Every structure is written in C-alpha cells, then in structure tokens.
C-alpha cells in the first residue's frame, strides 16, 4: 500500500486508428478499479498519428492507495474514445473491443498480470 507501480505498455498499430483514443491501466480485485492511470495521448502521441511502423512504448506510474487492503489485484489495460459520444457524455468512453487469435471479441480490456499487495 502507498507504493508506486511502474510499468510500460507496448502498443502495436496494424493501421492508423480512425479515432483519437485515450488509454487506461486499472488495478482491481474483481470490482471497480482501486487505482488507475488514464492518458489522453498514449505514449505522448495522438493515436491518429500511430502508423504500422512498429511498437509504441507507453510508460505508466500508478500510486497505490495508502489504505489498500492486502490481497491479489489484476492489472488491465485498454483504449477508449470520446469522439463517438455526445459532448460531455464520455464517462468510461467508448472502449475499443479486444479480440482473440480467432477473431472472437473477448471484452474491452486486456488483463496484463496480477500483483500481490502485502
């Protein structure tokens, strides 16, 4: 509890995205996030400028709450846009869907790993 969690997400665009996306990393234990980081321009670059030229490194620092109970937490990452929604109604945004190798939609965020808080 109270520690900083540092990680780097590697994004890879197969084509230039149609919309400008925000990125998020959530720390959760089966419910709403207990800590998170959101970025307007992942890796400091608008996603509309991403090309298929390789991986994009996107570093994050998340401060875990001082009163965070001990336990196991899952880190998830995803992208969302507000461009497809009415002005002022972004909320969680319109999240980009995640697909498995067979092309089946499996949700709107990718689990990265679990961490143990002591």
Model-predicted regions and their roles:
Residues 1-118:
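C-terminal luminal/periplasmic domains and tails of membrane-associated envelope-modifying transferases
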């Amino acid at each position: 509890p109270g520690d900083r969690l540092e990680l780097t997400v590697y994004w890879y665009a197969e084509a230039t995205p149609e919309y400008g996306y925000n990125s998020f990393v959530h720390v959760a234990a089966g419910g709403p996030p207990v800590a998170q980081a959101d970025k307007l321009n992942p890796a400091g670059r608008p996603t509309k400028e991403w090309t298929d030229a390789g991986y994009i490194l996107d570093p994050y620092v998340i401060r875990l709450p001082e009163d965070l109970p001990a336990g196991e937490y899952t880190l998830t990452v995803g992208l969302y846009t507000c461009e497809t929604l009415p002005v002022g109604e972004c909320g969680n945004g319109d999240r980009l869907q995640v697909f498995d190798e067979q092309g089946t939609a499996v949700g709107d965020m990718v689990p990265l790993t679990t961490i143990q808080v002591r």
